[in-house]
UniProtKB/Swiss-Prot annotation:
Belongs to the NleG E3 ligase family. This is Probable E3 ubiquitin-protein ligase NleG1. InterPro entries: Effector_NleG, Effector_NleG_sf. The gene is nleG1. GO terms for molecular function: ubiquitin-protein transferase activity. The keyword Transferase applies. Effector proteins function to alter host cell physiology and promote bacterial survival in host tissues. This protein is probably an E3 ubiquitin-protein ligase that interferes with the host's ubiquitination pathway and targets host proteins for proteasomal degradation. Mice infected with a strain of bacteria deleted for this gene have less severe diarrhea. Induction: Transcribed for 2-5 hours after treatment that induces type 3 secretion system expression. It comes from Citrobacter rodentium.
Amino acid sequence: MQPVGLSNTPASSLLNETAELRHQTTPRQLGGIRIVGEIVDISYEPNDVVFFGVGRGVMIGDILFPGSSADIMRELLMAHSGVRGILQQQENAPSSLQTRISECTFSVSQEKLQCPEEEMRCPVTLETPEKGVFVKNSGDSSVCTLFDSSSFSRLVRDGGVHPLTREPIKASMIVSSDKCVYDNAKGNFVIKNS
């Protein structure tokens, strides 16, 4: 997917969006919005010149000088370091990961998983989840870990990495329950026929 940047965003639209955000927030208040599938956290600090919102890999800005035009604002933002990659969409965007988590969530039962009870504990909650999701330990791993689907969804929403390997989470790492089996010899869940 291609990044959506300032060159692809009408300056007047960016001006209108950031001006609206400024009016919706009060001093020292935190909030958030979704722009092109990314959550952008907004923190308003009283300042008549600059208003910025920063999210996971995203930055929007509103530089307001009396009489400034959208073209001047565009030039100022382009000059600011780090703005060139504004509003990226990628395979690992939270929305596509959340969709994959929803697709692969299943009801956890010992009968279905055929594994020791302790292997059904989520490494995040340290409890057996009611609803679980299997996640490969890394992109090229055949080993999977069972997570509580709500906890894992929250981790993805917050921009976290894989809790065990610290690797960035990709949609291809989230596996449906019919593709995982407990391997007694290895003592963990693995991709079937691997």
